[in-house]
Amino acid sequence: MSIDFKKYIASVKDFPNEGIIFRDITPILQDGEAFAAATHEIAEYAKSRQADVIVGPEARGFLVGTPVAIELGIGFVPARKPHKLPREVEAAAYDLEYGSNVLEMHKDAIKPGQRVVICDDLMATAGTMHATKELIERLGGKVVGAAFYIELTDLKGREKFPDVDIFSLVQYTGA
């Protein structure tokens, strides 16, 4: 059975700032069938990319990536915001649609040569993906794909990564 995931995404105007339409994935997470279907579709994608490990950026990447890793029986590595990891880290800065931040990963989180699929809720300007990919590559991993619940195509994030296969459940163009 195919699910229309757009039915499970709430569009919230002027959040977190005026002029932004926030695409809220929590209705997918709240519906067991939709959540399982989204997880399965992304897991099938990651399997097709022969992923050894899933990396998810904080915070919603944890919600997307962890169940995918469980379904595939592979590891999950969190890319965290600053000062959340207790051991030695590698860090990368990035810009968002409405701010900037830093992501960190433990220096031993990715083994050299591991095939990595990045999982997150949304691809917009691709700042988060850029920082996540940079960290993975610095640690010796190979990004073989990226999967998102939502892609905002007008922001052209995909175009910044011609060398990465990108999958999204839902695409939005315009407002």
Swiss-Prot record:
InterPro entries: Ade_phspho_trans (IPR005764), PRibTrfase_dom (IPR000836), PRTase-like (IPR029057), UPRTase/APRTase (IPR050054)
Enzyme class: transferase
Family: Belongs to the purine/pyrimidine phosphoribosyltransferase family.
The encoding gene: apt
Keyword field: Cytoplasm, Glycosyltransferase, Purine salvage, Transferase
Catalytic function, reaction form: AMP + diphosphate = 5-phospho-alpha-D-ribose 1-diphosphate + adenine
EC number: 2.4.2.7
CDD domains named in the record: PRTases_typeI (cd06223)
Cross-referenced Pfam families: Pribosyltran (PF00156)
Annotated organism of origin: Lactobacillus delbrueckii subsp. bulgaricus (strain ATCC 11842 / DSM 20081 / BCRC 10696 / JCM 1002 / NBRC 13953 / NCIMB 11778 / NCTC 12712 / WDCM 00102 / Lb 14)
NCBIfam families from the UniProt entry: apt, PRK02304.1-2, PRK02304.1-3, PRK02304.1-5
Any one GO CC term of the record: cytoplasm
Name assigned to this protein: Adenine phosphoribosyltransferase
Cysteines joined through disulfide linkages: none
Subcellular location: Cytoplasm
Pathway where this protein functions: Purine metabolism; AMP biosynthesis via salvage pathway; AMP from adenine: step 1/1
Subunit structure, interactors included: Homodimer.
Molecular-function GO terms, alphabetical: adenine binding; adenine phosphoribosyltransferase activity; AMP binding
Keyword Cytoplasm: yes
GO terms, biological process: adenine salvage; AMP salvage; purine ribonucleoside salvage
Function: Catalyzes a salvage reaction resulting in the formation of AMP, that is energically less costly than de novo synthesis.
